[in-house]
Amino acid sequence: MAATAECDVVMAATEPELLEDEDAKREAESFKEQGNAYYAKKDYNEAYNYYTKAIDMCPNNASYYGNRAATLMMLGRFREALGDAQQSVRLDDSFVRGHLREGKCHLSLGNAMAACRSFQRALELDHKNAQAQQEFKNANAVMEYEKIAEVDFEKRDFRKVVFCMDRALEFAPACHRFKILKAECLAMLGRYPEAQFVASDILRMDSTNADALYVRGLCLYYEDCIEKAVQFFVQALRMAPDHEKACVACRNAKALKAKKEDGNKAFKEGNYKLAYELYTEALGIDPNNIKTNAKLYCNRGTVNSKLRQLEDAIEDCTNAVKLDDTYIKAYLRRAQCYMDTEQFEEAVRDYEKVYQTEKTKEHKQLLKNAQLELKKSKRKDYYKILGVDKNASEDEIKKAYRKRALMHHPDRHSGASAEVQKEEEKKFKEVGEAFTILSDPKKKTRYDSGQDLDEEGMNMGDFDANNIFKAFFGGPGGFSFEASGPGNFYFQFG
């Protein structure tokens, strides 16, 4: 009897291992049905809970894992769903929906090749399955978008890469790799808010994602927030020490910051030659950093203006606004250089651009000044006519008049052609006009200030150049021209 009891005990211990408990099976089915009901109501969290209870009761039922995988997919938890789908086909390799869900999870996560294998297996089991056929096409399309994007990235056609990634993400919405590539290209295109949004979204789900940290840093770096950018690059390298892009970006950011600061220091100390060299070196570090390079060009333009290399300064400022057409400081610097080189039309154009952007009193006055100088430049330039500087003294103006008046006097050219005589007479008259204005302090002041423009000129209607000439040289008999052969004259003054 003792032996029989011992045997019963042994039988009681092994029965649960050999026979499935019918009650457990029924309870598991009940949980599954409740899960189905919640799934139908789109209450996926409750559906997940009941499918989990069913699995706990019967862990070897493939359909339970398949159902829970479907629920996790609806919740966007594709990696967990993939695990359940894979378990379902391990338990039952003929489970077509299990293979479909496995493929769908692979595709959603961006593994198109693995997805193709799953869909192929589903088609082997059911070659007419329309869903498997369509999903197989989708997976192949994603692989094609990946290939195109890879080639276009090397070509630096970032707009095309963004397009390809958008198409791929329609089938692979949970693929961080595609999102990161898109975000990086958005950053390269200067679309920083969009790039930051994508990277931040990934970091909310995975704060240790080195690629997302790199892209966040890249956006800050290209927005000229270099110190903050370095912090993100360092964090990315902490998560992935071999992250090559983060390493290069971090090195460039530090070098750019150092060179720019050294250039600023040299400029403040008045060492313009050194500042020029440092800004030039900084410009060679990273041609992709548009905002920082725009500032560097403007800074170098300022240095060139200090060195009175005004055309070089204009070129630097032009490069700055090409990189950043909203850069007010560069427009102002270039406009001043245009004023200094008497390119008034260009100066007016730049000041108009500035005033349209920032309607301040200061900018309005700068525009008015440039417009006045432009008007003044279109009238006769009496200083040029006499060949004197704007700061010329009274004696210098008189000497210049004496020289030019004698040079262009009609009597000197009496033997020339009618055309030459006419031109010299015109110049003689202009010389007289110039002397009349510049030798009179009041008229000169009005001319210099542009008041004559508002007064519709200097009213030279009664002007006679010969009278000015006679008065200057002492009246009739005070001078004479004597010809000595063609083109030769002697001037004799009383």
From Swiss-Prot:
Location(s), subcellular: Cytoplasm; Nucleus; Cytoplasm, Cytoskeleton
Disulphides: none
Record Pfam families: DnaJ (PF00226), TPR_11 (PF13414), TPR_8 (PF13181)
Domain of life: Eukaryota
Residue numbers bearing the N-acetylalanine modification: A2
Segments annotated as TPR repeats: 28-61, 62-95, 96-129, 142-175, 210-243, 256-289, 294-327, 328-361
Protein's recorded name: DnaJ homolog subfamily C member 7
Native organism: Mus musculus
Gene coding for it: Dnajc7
